[in-house]
UniProtKB/Swiss-Prot annotation:
The protein's name: Type IV pilus inner membrane component PilN
Any one GO cellular component localisation term in the record: plasma membrane
Compartment list: Cell inner membrane
Encoding gene per record: pilN
Protein role: Inner membrane component of the type IV (T4S) secretion system that plays a role in surface and host cell adhesion, colonization, biofilm maturation, virulence, and twitching, a form of surface-associated motility. PilN/PilO heterodimers form the foundation of the inner-membrane PilM/PilN/PilO/PilP complex which plays an essential role in the assembly of a functional T4 pilus. In turn, associates with PilM and facilitates PilM functionally relevant structural changes.
Protein's membrane topology: Single-pass type II membrane protein
Species: Pseudomonas aeruginosa (strain ATCC 15692 / DSM 22644 / CIP 104116 / JCM 14847 / LMG 12228 / 1C / PRS 101 / PAO1)
């Protein structure tokens, strides 16, 4: 005779499927939690790594800013030294010229004229002095105009001043340009050459 199984197999099957579903659901939850944890760990490590890089870059930027400032100070100091060297070289180069100019001032000085003040700014020489007469001042200006080292004397002022009961002097102020022999010829030749090129 055939055997009939009267056990509630459908309920057992349902119960078995329910257990499988719960096991799968638990596995998915555990896997999701593990995935979230690993993702959090990864992003935390990435953020910490980036923060470490940023800190390193900030420190390097501070070091580079200090070096840039130091380089800027060195450039400024170098420029000051170059300017000082140029001034010293100009003074050394002009030393014989200044001696010649003073020699020419003495040579152009006629009798009865003396200088009370002399100021040289660049190539301009401002002279103050006194003379016995206006003719002596005129002689001084003619002598300066004839000099190779002096040019363009300009009389600014002449005043008659009484010194004591009898003496009278003419106080004057004039300006003159310092030049070098051959300098005007060189400028004229350069101007002619420039005109020929045009």
């Amino acid at each position: 005779m055939a055997r009939i199984n009267l056990l509630p197999w459908r309920e057992e099957l349902r119960e078995q499927r329910k257990q499988q579903f719960l096991v799968i659901l638990g596995g998915v939850l555990v896997a999701s939690a593990a995935l979230v944890f690993l993702g959090d760990q990864y992003f935390t490590a990435a953020i910490e790594n980036q923060n470490a890089r940023n800190d390193f870059l900030r420190k390097e930027i501070v070091v580079l800013d200090a070096r840039i400032k130091e380089i800027s100070e060195l450039k400024s100091r170098r420029q000051q030294l170059l300017e000082r060297m140029k001034i010293i070289q100009d003074l050394q180069g002009n030393r014989p010229i200044i001696g010649r100019v003073f020699d020419q001032l003495v040579r152009t000085l006629p009798d009865g004229v003396y200088f009370t003040d002399l100021k040289m700014t660049g190539k301009n020489i401002a002279i103050a002095g006194a003379a016995e007469s206006n003719n002596r001042v005129s002689n001084l200006m003619r002598n300066m105009d004839a000099s190779e080292w002096l040019t363009a004397p300009t009389l600014n002022e002449v005043k008659a001043v009484t010194q004591g009961a009898v003496d009278q002097a003419n106080v004057f102020q004039l300006t003159v340009q310092q030049t070098q022999p051959g300098e005007e010829d060189a400028k004229a030749k350069h101007g002619v050459a420039q005109g020929a090129k045009k």
